[in-house]
UniProtKB/Swiss-Prot annotation:
NCBIfam families: rpmD_bact (TIGR01308). Part of the 50S ribosomal subunit. CDD domains: Ribosomal_L30. This is Large ribosomal subunit protein uL30. Coiled coil: none annotated. One of its GO terms (cellular component) is cytosolic large ribosomal subunit. Signal peptide: none annotated. Keywords: Ribonucleoprotein, Ribosomal protein. GO terms for biological process: translation. Belongs to the universal ribosomal protein uL30 family.
C-alpha cells in the first residue's frame, strides 16, 4: 500500500481566497477539525503547502 498522510483543518475558511477554499475541499476537508487521509503524492503535498496556514499534517 502506498504511503498516506493525514491532514486536519485547524482554521476556518471565512475570509480566505476562493482558490484556497477550493483547495481545502479538494483535500476532502469540510469543517474545522475534520481529518482526511490521502495518498502521499507530489500533487497532494503541493495542495497542503498552498494552504499550510489553514491545515496541519497529523501524521
Amino acid at each position: 500500500m502506498a504511503n498516506t498522510v493525514k491532514v486536519k483543518l485547524v482554521k476556518g475558511l471565512i475570509g480566505t481566497r476562493e482558490t484556497h477554499r477550493a483547495t481545502v475541499r479538494g483535500l476532502g476537508l469540510r469543517g474545522i477539525n475534520s481529518v482526511s487521509e490521502l495518498e502521499d503524492t507530489p500533487a497532494v503535498r503541493g495542495m497542503i503547502n498552498k494552504v499550510s496556514y489553514l491545515v496541519k499534517v497529523v501524521s
